[in-house]
Amino acid sequence: MGLEKSLMLFPLFVLLLGWVQPSLGRESSAQKFQRQHMDPAGSSSNSPTYCNQMMKRRDMTKGSCKPVNTFVHEPLADVQAICSQENVTCKNGKSNCYKSSSALHITDCHLKGNSKYPNCDYKTSQYQKQIIVACEGNPYVPVHFDATV
């Protein structure tokens, strides 16, 4: 009887798995923002090879070299709180961008001019600057790094 019940439930399980599984491999916009821009510890951000290591580690050198990226070295909660700070217009003209009320510790990574894929070579520069992020969702969280000021 237990086997019979299992055989009846198996097709339902397969159907459910097929419905849920595709979303398992998909990264949300908020998760992508965190992968590409958050490094709260930032322990080796003062190293000249920081950007080379982090860009590779965070999958931004697969297939091509991402030309520019910024890492934020602040707690995630502090960066998420920017979504309730000063509303500003995004570079693309949308109205869902917000500017941090204070300067944050960031590292800018710029692809060096002579660098070619697959040997992505970045210049690492540290700053204390305000940042602008685009926010979406419920809860309202950063999904795009728009600029520094």
UniProtKB/Swiss-Prot annotation:
Enzyme kind, highest EC tier: lyase
Carbohydrate attachment residues: 87
Signal peptide: 1-25
Catalytic function, reaction form: an [RNA] containing cytidine + H2O = an [RNA]-3'-cytidine-3'-phosphate + a 5'-hydroxy-ribonucleotide-3'-[RNA]; an [RNA] containing uridine + H2O = an [RNA]-3'-uridine-3'-phosphate + a 5'-hydroxy-ribonucleotide-3'-[RNA]
Subcellular location: Secreted
Pfam families: RnaseA
Region Disordered, annotated ranges: 30-49
Residues at the active site: 37, 144
Assigned EC number: 4.6.1.18
GO cellular component, as recorded: extracellular region
Cross-referenced InterPro entries: RNaseA (IPR001427), RNaseA-like_dom_sf (IPR036816), RNaseA_AS (IPR023411), RNaseA_domain (IPR023412)
Domain of life: Eukaryota
Single GO MF descriptor: ribonuclease A activity
Protease recorded as keyword: no
Family indicated by similarity: Belongs to the pancreatic ribonuclease family.
Summary of subunit composition and partner proteins: Monomer. Interacts with and forms tight 1:1 complexes with RNH1. Dimerization of two such complexes may occur. Interaction with RNH1 inhibits this protein.
Protein name from the UniProt record: Ribonuclease pancreatic
Species: Mus saxicola (Brown spiny mouse)
